[in-house]
């Protein structure tokens, strides 16, 4: 799973790649270093739903945060024209470029997504999926006009969670102050059916899928 819990130095932190997950060396509550899982392939069902939302219009899709490439794979399976991916971590950006090597409709941009936006390196998109390391506190980019990279009817969805160093679940906007607050966002409930734990989300519990249409 992609990363929400690390500071600006995250992009230079060494990651460790395992078969089903990715870890980073992190300081625990006792002050000792311990491996923290920051991405895990148990998120397939959630990422599939996010991909369905952002690719509903087809066309040009922007994905922020490549992670393990799970959501990217589902986005590619949709009827889309182009797929732009912004990834800030150097190791993951390398993996994204390897993944995209045989996909002519994919463009990989390495860098902080806010910088890429402010530097006007992006076009307009029909769908956007946000799952970067540091999504919290990003509301201003969507509230203060003009947000210039959305076509009319563009569908935005974003990972609905908080600190991934702790077990947690997705929350509705009015249930947790740390959820990204973008006016006009609707939430659709998704029942977690798998018996595999998803960041503290147990079988039968609900994850709330955000959607905003511009």
Briefly describe each language-model feature range.
Residues 59, 81, 126:
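Conserved acidic residues
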Residues 68-80:
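Conserved SAM-binding loop of SAM-dependent methyltransferases across substrates and taxa
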Residues 88-121:
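S-adenosyl-L-methionine
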Residues 57-67:
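Conserved class I S-adenosyl-L-methionine
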Residues 82-87, 158:
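Conserved SAM-binding motif I beta-strand of class I
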Residues 119-128, 132:
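A short acidic, Gly/Pro-enriched loop at the edge of an enzyme's catalytic core
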Residues 92-95, 99, 136-214:
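C-terminal substrate-binding/active-site "lid" region of AdoMet-derived donor-dependent transferases
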Residues 2-57:
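Class I SAM-dependent methyltransferase Rossmann-like catalytic core
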């Amino acid at each position: 799973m992609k990363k929400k819990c690390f500071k600006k130095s995250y992009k230079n932190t060494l990651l460790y790649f395992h078969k089903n997950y990715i870890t980073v060396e992190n300081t625990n509550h006792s002050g000792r270093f311990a491996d923290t899982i920051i991405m895990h392939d148990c998120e397939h069902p959630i990422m599939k739903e996010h991909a369905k939302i952002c690719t509903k219009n087809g066309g040009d899709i922007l994905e922020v945060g490549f992670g393990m490439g799970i959501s990217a794979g589902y986005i590619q399976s949709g009827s889309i024209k182009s797929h732009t991916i912004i990834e800030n971590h150097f190791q993951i950006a390398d993996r994204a470029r390897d993944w995209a090597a045989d996909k002519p409709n994919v463009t990989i941009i390495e860098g902080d997504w806010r910088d890429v936006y402010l530097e006007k390196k992006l076009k307009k998109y029909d769908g956007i999926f946000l799952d970067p390391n540091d999504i919290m506190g990003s509301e201003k980019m969507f509230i203060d006009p003009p947000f210039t990279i959305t076509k009319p009817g563009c569908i935005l969805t974003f990972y609905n969670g908080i600190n991934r160093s702790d077990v947690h679940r997705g929350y509705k906007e009015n249930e947790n102050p740390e959820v990204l607050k973008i006016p006009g966002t609707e939430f659709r409930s998704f029942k977690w059916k798998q018996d595999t734990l998803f960041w503290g989300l147990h079988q039968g519990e609900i994850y709330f899928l955000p959607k905003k249409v511009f």
